[in-house]
Amino acid sequence: MKKIAIAAAALFAFSGTAHAQMVRAQDPSSVARALQGAGYKAEMTKDDTGDPLIRSTSSGSNFAIFFFGCTKNVDCRTIQFFAGYDRDKSPSLSQMNDWNSKKRFGRAYLSDKGAARIEMDVDLDDGGISTKLFEDNLEFWVLLMAQFEKHIDS
C-alpha cells in the first residue's frame, strides 16, 4: 500500500511539473517565457480589442504573436506569429501567389496598402504544447521570415 502511495505521489508531482512546462495560449506569460527561454525578447501588451499580444524581434525584423479564440480577453486558444513589411516597392500579387503555392506553412498576402504580410498559426488549445515543440515552431517561424524577406526583396 505504501508503494502505491509513493508511486501516486510521484505521478502527481511529475504531471504538475510537465504541466508547468507547457506553453499555453490560456497563459500568455508561458508563451513569453518560452520566447525568452529561446533567447528572444518578449514585450507583453494588448491588441486593439484587449487580447494579449507579444512583440519580439529576430535578426532586426519585428514580429508579433497574436492570441485568438479568447473569451473576454482571457482563456485564449491559439496564437499566430505575424510579420508585416512596408517596403519602398510593394511586392507583386504574383510574388505572393508564388510563395503560397510553394510553401506549406507561412501564409502570405498583401495588405490594403500593398504591404507584404506573413502569418503562421499554432494551436495551443487542449493543454498547450511542450516548450521544446514551441521552440521548434519558433525556429521554423524565424526561418520562414528570413526566406520571406528574401522572396519579397527579389
Language model region names:
Residues 4-15:
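Sec-dependent N-terminal signal peptides
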Residues 7-8, 46-48, 58, 67-69, ...:
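A mature extracytoplasmic/lumenal domain signature
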Residues 16-20:
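Sec/Tat signal peptide C-region and signal peptidase I cleavage site
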Residues 21-73:
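N-terminal secretory signal peptides
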Residues 22, 77-117:
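Short, internal acidic amphipathic alpha-helical interface segments
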Residues 28, 32-35, 93, 135-138, ...:
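Extracytoplasmic/secreted envelope proteins and their assembly/folding machinery
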Residues 105-145:
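A short, solvent-exposed beta-edge/loop patch
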Residues 146-154:
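Flexible helix-coil linker/hinge segments at domain or subdomain boundaries
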